[in-house]
C-alpha cells in the first residue's frame, strides 16, 4: 500500500524542477502501480470529505521541465518516478508485409533507459503475457527500431513527455510526441479509470463520449477554438474528429493521472549523421535554413544557436569543469545551424552532406567550418554541446539567485 507522507525537509527537492521555481505542499506519495494511484486519490478524497477541503494534486515525473509544471502550489505531490516498468509489447501487420511494433510502459520510465533498451534490444519481459512475448520475439529478431521524439534532456520521463506533448529537435521530421502515442490508461480524480486506444473514440458533434472501466459515462465538450498548425502548448488539444487519446496528451496532468502509455516504434534509419554549420552573419544562417528546408530531404532536425548561446558555451567552457570538454567553436562564428540527417545509405548521406556544403557556399559561408558527427561517440559529443546551452542558462540563474533571490 502506498503511503501518503508529510512533505518534510527530506523531500524538499520535490518542491522544484529545472525551472528553478520552488513551491510548497503538505504531503507526498510515490505510487508504483495504477491501483496505488487510485488508493492515494481515494484517501485524499476521504480526508477532504472529513475536513470539507479540496486538495490539489501535483503530478510529477522526472522534474526536468523548464516551465514549472512539476512545481506544486499547495496540497499533495504525487511523484511517479517509481512507476518505471515495461508492461508489454504489441505487434501487428502494417498492411504492406511489415510488422508494426508497440511498447507499453509506466510513466516513470526514463528516456535514456528506454533509448538504450531499444538500441540494445534489452527490454525486460518478465511478466509479459503470451501476446506480448510474441511481439517481444519479433522485436528481438527484427530490424532495429526507435522512438522518434527526442527531447534534449535524457532524464525526462515518458509520462512527463506525454503530459507536456514534448517535441525536441526531431519534431522537424516526426512531429511532437502526440501522434506516436497509441494508447493510454488514465486514473481520473474520482478514482475511475479510462482505457483509451487510438481510433476507438473520436469527437462527434463537438463531444467526446468516454466510458470508464467501471462503467461510468463522461461527455466531454471539445473546445471550438482552432489550433495553430505550429508547435503549441497552450490549452487542451481540440480538432474536428479528434481522438480521445489526443485530449490527454499535452494536458499536463490536469485531467487525470496517466498510468500506462503505449508508444509506436518506428524503423530506425540506417545512417544518422549530425552536422553543425557555423556562420559569421545571422542572415547567412537564415538564408541557409530557408534553402535547406527545400533541398535537404533527409533532415530530421534543424536547430538554431544564436550569438548569445555560443557566448554562454564559450564562457562555461573556460569557467566550469563540467563543460571543460566542450569543443571550441570556429573563430568569428556568430551563430550555428545544427542539421541531423537520417538516410537509408551512406551514399545518400554523403549526397546530402555535399548539398549542405553547396548551400553554405551559396550564402557566403565557409563549408569547412562545420562539425560532422558520423559515429555514436561524435553524436553524443554533439548532443552534449546542444544540451549545454539550457543547462548553462540554469546554472547562471542559480548563481544570480545567490545575490538577487
Q: What does each model-identified segment do?
A:
Residues 28, 77, 183, 276-278, ...:
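Conserved hydrophobic/aromatic beta-strand scaffold that supports enzyme active sites
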Residues 87-89, 95, 107, 111-112, ...:
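FAD-binding subdomain of flavoenzyme oxidoreductases
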Residues 61-64, 199, 304-307:
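Short, ordered loop/turn segments at secondary-structure junctions
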Residues 4-11, 249-251, 257-405:
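C-terminal substrate-recognition/cap domain of FAD-linked oxidoreductases
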Residues 34-37, 83, 111, 282, ...:
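Residues at or immediately preceding the N-termini of alpha-helices
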Residues 1-55, 62-101, 116-120, 126, ...:
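N-terminal flexible segment immediately upstream of the FAD-binding catalytic core
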Residues 57-61, 147-148, 302:
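ATP-grasp fold ATP-binding core
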Residues 60, 79, 106, 159-161, ...:
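Short beta-strand segments
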Amino acid at each position: 500500500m502506498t503511503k501518503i507522507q508529510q512533505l518534510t525537509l527530506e523531500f524538499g527537492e520535490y518542491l522544484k524542477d529545472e525551472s528553478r521555481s520552488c513551491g510548497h505542499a503538505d504531503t507526498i506519495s510515490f505510487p508504483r502501480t495504477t491501483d496505488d494511484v487510485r488508493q492515494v486519490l481515494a484517501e485524499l478524497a476521504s480526508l477532504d470529505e472529513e475536513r470539507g477541503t479540496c486538495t490539489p494534486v501535483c503530478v510529477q515525473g522526472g522534474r526536468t521541465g523548464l516551465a514549472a509544471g512539476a512545481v506544486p502550489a499547495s496540497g499533495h505531490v504525487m511523484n511517479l518516478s517509481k512507476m518505471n516498468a515495461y508492461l508489454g509489447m504489441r505487434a501487428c501487420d502494417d498492411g504492406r508485409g511489415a510488422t508494426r511494433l508497440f511498447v507499453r510502459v509506466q510513466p516513470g520510465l526514463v528516456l535514456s533507459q528506454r533509448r538504450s533498451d531499444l538500441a540494445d534490444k534489452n527490454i525486460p519481459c518478465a511478466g509479459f503475457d503470451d501476446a506480448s512475448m510474441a511481439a517481444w520475439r519479433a522485436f528481438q529478431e527484427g530490424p532495429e527500431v526507435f522512438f522518434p521524439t527526442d527531447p534534449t534532456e535524457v532524464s525526462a520521463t515518458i509520462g512527463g513527455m506525454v503530459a507536456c506533448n514534448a517535441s525536441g529537435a526531431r519534431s522537424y521530421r516526426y512531429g511532437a510526441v502526440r501522434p506516436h502515442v497509441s494508447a493510454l490508461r488514465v486514473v481520473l480524480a474520482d478514482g475511475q479509470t479510462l482505457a483509451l486506444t487510438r481510433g476507438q473514440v473520436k469527437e462527434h458533434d463537438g463531444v467526446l463520449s468516454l466510458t470508464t472501466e467501471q462503467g461510468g459515462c463522461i461527455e466531454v465538450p471539445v473546445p471550438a477554438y482552432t489550433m495553430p498548425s505550429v508547435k503549441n502548448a497552450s490549452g487542451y488539444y481540440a480538432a474536428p474528429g479528434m481522438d480521445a487519446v489526443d485530449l490527454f496528451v499535452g494536458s499536463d496532468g490536469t485531467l487525470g493521472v496517466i498510468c500506462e502509455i503505449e508508444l509506436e516504434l518506428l524503423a530506425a534509419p540506417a545512417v544518422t549523421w549530425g552536422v553543425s554549420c557555423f556562420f559569421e552573419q545571422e542572415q547567412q544562417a537564415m538564408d541557409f535554413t530557408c534553402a535547406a528546408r527545400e533541398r535537404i530531404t533527409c533532415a530530421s532536425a534543424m536547430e538554431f544557436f544564436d550569438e548569445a548561446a555560443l557566448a554562454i558555451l564559450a564562457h562555461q567552457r573556460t569557467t566550469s569543469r563540467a563543460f571543460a570538454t566542450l569543443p571550441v567553436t570556429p573563430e568569428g562564428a556568430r551563430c550555428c545551424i545544427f542539421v541531423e540527417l537520417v538516410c537509408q545509405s551512406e551514399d545518400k548521406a554523403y549526397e546530402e552532406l555535399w548539398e549542405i556544403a553547396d548551400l553554405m557556399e551559396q550564402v557566403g559561408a565557409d563549408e569547412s567550418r562545420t562539425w560532422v558527427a558520423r559515429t555514436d561517440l561524435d553524436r553524443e559529443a554533439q548532443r552534449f554541446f546542444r544540451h549545454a546551452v539550457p543547462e548553462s542558462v540554469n546554472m547562471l540563474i542559480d548563481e544570480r539567485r545567490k545575490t538577487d533571490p
